[in-house]
Amino acid sequence: MTNTLTVDQLQELLKIQKEFDDRIPTKNLNDTVASMIIEYVEWVNTLEFFKNWKKTPGKDLDTQLDELSDFLAFNLQLALEVIDGNELNEFIDVMVNLVEEQEDLPRLHSVYFVHALHTLTGQFVNGIDSSIVQVIVMPFLYANQYYS
């Protein structure tokens, strides 16, 4: 398995997410952000890296991937809500390049998790700007780190 994301793949994921989102009449940015952060924490909980009292921490792979896919879905929804349609192609190129260049994302541990959570929440507390791409790319980078 290669650690790549193509422009076509990301375009297809965004298309699928848009089709899904178009069926939801009451979307709003605050709910998307809250859901995305909650799904991130739910995925982290499946890793159980912080449960040092367990002999074999970590939920089964299907559970982990299910939660990561939920996290990804809300990141894609967030991208569709905050990225202007005219800038979507540029955003896609930036995302694909970030995934290609970022090969050494550290595995999560308690301190790094808190830092990552701070990055997620800080983006919204301080106002969304072009650095939102650092948040939206996270599920892809974690997928490369944990499941490639």
Where in the sequence are the language-model features?
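Flexible "arm" and connector segments at domain edges
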Residues: M1-S148
